[in-house]
C-alpha cells in the first residue's frame, strides 16, 4: 500500500526535523484535526528523548486528544522505544 499525500507530508516533516539538527531520529505526528507536529531526538549527556516521544508530547501539550498517524525516520535498522 502506497502512503497517501497526508502520510507523505508527515514523512517529509520527520525527515526535515532530523536533518535540521543532524539528529539520529526525526518524527512527526498528525492529530485528529489534521495538525502536524515534528521533532528530532534529543541526545545530551544528561537527557535522552526519542523523536516520537517529543512529537507526541508536543501534540498533547497543544491540546490534541488523539493521533491518527505517526512517522519515524532514522538511519538505524531498529529504533529503541
What are the residue ranges of the model-derived segments?
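Short, small/polar residue-rich loop motifs at catalytic or cofactor-binding pockets
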Residues: 21-25
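Short beta-strand scaffold segments in enzyme catalytic cores
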Residues: 26-35
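Residues at the start of alpha-helices and the adjacent loop-to-helix junctions
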Residues: 6-9, 26, 47, 51
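A short, polar/charged loop-to-alpha-helix boundary motif
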Residues: 44-58
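C-terminal binding/interaction regions
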Residues: 1-20, 62-81
Amino acid at each position: 500500500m502506497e502512503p497517501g499525500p497526508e502520510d507523505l507530508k508527515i514523512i517529509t516533516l520527520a525527515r526535515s526535523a532530523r536533518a535540521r539538527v543532524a539528529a539520529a531520529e526525526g518524527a512527526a505526528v498528525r492529530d485528529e484535526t489534521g495538525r502536524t507536529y515534528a521533532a528530532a531526538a534529543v541526545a545530551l549527556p544528561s537527557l535522552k528523548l526519542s523523536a516520537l516521544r517529543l512529537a507526541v508530547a508536543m501534540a498533547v501539550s497543544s491540546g490534541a486528544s488523539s493521533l491518527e498517524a505517526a512517522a519515524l525516520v532514522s538511519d538505524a535498522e531498529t529504533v529503541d522505544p
